[in-house]
């Protein structure tokens, strides 16, 4: 079936947007392809449509579990066979999903990068008929990117197993260097890049110089109505700012990675359903969240890079209507940004000291410790050896990048359990309390595979089903564990250190140029770019951002604080206004007109399409099928 027919049949759209069609044809022809599309540009269509058109299963690599689940649900609702593999599934569920892919029962299989290299996945992958591999958030593979993830580096190894399978890499943020690095790391057979302009014509970028950021924040949220996200750097600040907003009669809540899964889900749902207007969050919030009507994104603190800022700011106005991205800035921010360089890259002697102290802490001698995992309390560790918490955390991350340890500082793994008795033995038990009976019954109804393997459980859900409090449920599970009826592994919240190699003496710790000096230099460049953006009040904000991402021929936007201060509008904005006004004048008779009637206006097709989209979004005209009118 032709691509456009698939788009109409499954999504109900008449045509592709922007560079979607170019990317689809490229991967459809078997060419390695990199697509650069801003947030809201329709990335998912570029791999979902060709996945349906081509024989076999498309493997989609993404780090975003929430996005995986959301996209799989939407695909299944459309009658498209899709599945995902993520933490929380039993081994039997994973095997069933993989075998479904092997035997042709799936068109799309979503997998996190960490799970790609389990023996189980690789053994099944070898037998799959793979149409192509999609790498979402592809900037994560680049060490020059702002969100490098080491697990992404191994994706190219899949090509050794299936060298004929093409790769589609997608990202919403990438500089010229990162674009080249992505293609090199994924072993592209030939360079092949499709770029969609990162320009957002409905988004107004604003920098507010504010000595009192809290007062300015309240002023903005009172002036701009609608859904909002406020980004801050610390977990503590999320709670403080949310309370400040509530004290000023603005409905708000807060979100950060340290909250319980259940709490995060509830708060996210309340915000998405507009029960809560403002989400105050760290950068843990936003990726994979589909809420098109966010009217303003406000950064109380400057991010570490323009890539991060552009992606977070881009969560505003995805419905095409006017929206704002505001950065609150003052002279103290520049000092804080410069301080982050030293905080992220401690002196090499400090890194070696942390490594040796870690070995002393766990009593690991030189030449031993490889493969061992230890619970880790960074506050206790720093106190014991009189170390700075900030510099220690950064040192551990560098040591991890060097390949000596695995440092998991923010785990939130769900609880797991497995029955130690058979189903028949459970039924014969006569010494269970009523509550224990309720819990066992709920477990058997909610989860399969409990008699064969450890299964991740949702304690909040089980508590709801049984009418117990989470504390009561926890005590019952601990009691059943003590009586050897089941084995219960509570939710792990304690960070841990895994020694990937046997210990070496700190003086022999090899801190390579690529991991330290080169990355530090790149970090400094990104910090300086943020400062330059915030302090440059002479060049259009949109032009500054577009230039950073390699678009050097853009015009002034006419909407940002710089342009409005100058009282200027770009030539393109003036053309668009002329085009919109011509359409409104044509429809001023309040009659229904066919779209083809607009041909008499002789407007450029690109301007006509954009003008119509704007007028429909702003509800200035009505569009039904191929007819339009003004009420």
Spans of model-derived segments:
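Helicase motor core with emphasis on the C-terminal RecA-like subdomain
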Residues: 1-10, 14-44, 50-54, 59, ...
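C-terminal accessory region of SF2 helicases/translocases
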Residues: 276, 293-294, 298, 302-311, ...
């Amino acid at each position: 079936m032709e691509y456009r027919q698939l788009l109409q049949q499954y999504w109900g759209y008449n045509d592709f947007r922007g560079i979607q069609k170019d990317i689809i044809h490229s991967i459809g022809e078997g060419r390695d392809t990199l697509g650069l599309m801003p947030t809201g540009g329709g990335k998912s269509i570029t791999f979902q449509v060709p996945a349906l058109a081509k024989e076999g299963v498309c493997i989609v690599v993404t780090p975003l579990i929430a996005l995986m689940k959301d996209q799989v649900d939407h695909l299944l609702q459309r009658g498209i066979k899709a599945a995902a593999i993520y933490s929380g599934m039993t081994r039997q569920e994973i095997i069933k999903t993989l075998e479904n892919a092997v035997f042709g029962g799936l068109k799309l299989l979503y997998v996190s990068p960490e799970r790609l290299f389990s023996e189980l996945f690789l053994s099944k992958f070898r037998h799959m008929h793979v149409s192509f591999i999609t790498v979402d958030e592809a900037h994560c593979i680049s060490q020059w990117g702002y969100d490098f993830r080491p697990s992404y580096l191994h994706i190219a190894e899949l090509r050794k197993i299936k060298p004929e399978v093409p790769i589609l890499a997608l990202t919403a943020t990438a500089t010229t260097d990162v674009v080249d690095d992505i293609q090199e790391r994924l072993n592209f057979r030939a360079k092949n890049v499709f770029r969609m302009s990162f320009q957002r014509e409905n988004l107004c970028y604003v920098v507010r110089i504010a000595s009192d950021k809290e007062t300015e924040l309240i002023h903005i949220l009172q002036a701009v109505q609608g859904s909002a996200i406020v980004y801050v750097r610390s977990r503590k600040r999320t709670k403080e700012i949310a309370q400040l907003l509530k004290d000023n009669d603005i409905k708000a809540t807060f979100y950060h990675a340290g909250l319980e899964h259940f709490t995060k889900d509830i708060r996210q749902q309340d915000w998405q359903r507009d029960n809560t207007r403002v989400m105050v969050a760290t950068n843990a919030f936003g990726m994979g969240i589909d809420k098109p009507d966010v009217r303003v994104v406000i950064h109380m603190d400057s991010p570490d890079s323009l890539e991060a800022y552009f992606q977070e700011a881009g969560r505003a106005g995805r419905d095409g209507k006017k929206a704002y991205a505001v950065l609150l800035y003052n002279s103290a921010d520049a000092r804080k940004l410069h301080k982050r360089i030293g905080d992220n890259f401690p002196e090499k002697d400090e890194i070696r000291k942390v490594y040796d102290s870690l070995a002393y802490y766990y009593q690991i001698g030189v030449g031993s410790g490889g493969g061992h995992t230890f619970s880790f309390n960074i506050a206790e560790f720093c106190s014991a050896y009189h170390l700075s918490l900030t510099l220690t955390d950064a040192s551990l991350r560098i040591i991890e990048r060097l390949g000596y340890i695995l440092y998991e500082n923010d785990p939130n793994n769900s609880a797991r359990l497995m029955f130690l008795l058979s189903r028949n033995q459970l039924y014969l038990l006569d010494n269970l309390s009523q509550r224990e009976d309720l819990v066992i019954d709920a477990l058997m109804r909610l989860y399969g595979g409990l008699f064969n393997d450890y299964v991740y459980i949702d304690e909040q859900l089980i508590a709801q089903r049984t009418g117990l409090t989470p504390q009561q449920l926890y005590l019952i599970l601990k009691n059943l564990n003590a009586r050897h009826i089941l084995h219960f592994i509570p939710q792990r919240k304690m960070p841990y250190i895994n020694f990937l190699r046997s210990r070496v003496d700190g003086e022999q710790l090899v801190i390579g140029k690529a991991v330290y000096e080169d990355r530090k230099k790149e970090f400094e460049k990104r910090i300086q770019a943020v400062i330059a953006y915030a302090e440059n009040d002479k060049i259009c904000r949109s032009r500054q951002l577009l230039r950073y991402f390699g678009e050097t021929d853009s015009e002034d936007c006419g909407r940002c604080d710089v342009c409005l201060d100058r009282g200027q509008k770009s030539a393109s904005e003036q053309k668009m206004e002329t085009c919109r006004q011509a359409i409104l004048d044509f429809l001023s008779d309040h009659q229904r007109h066919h779209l083809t009637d607009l041909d008499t206006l002789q407007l450029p097709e690109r301007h006509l399409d954009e003008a119509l989209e704007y007028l429909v979004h702003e509800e200035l005209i009505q569009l039904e099928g191929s007819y339009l009118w003004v009420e």
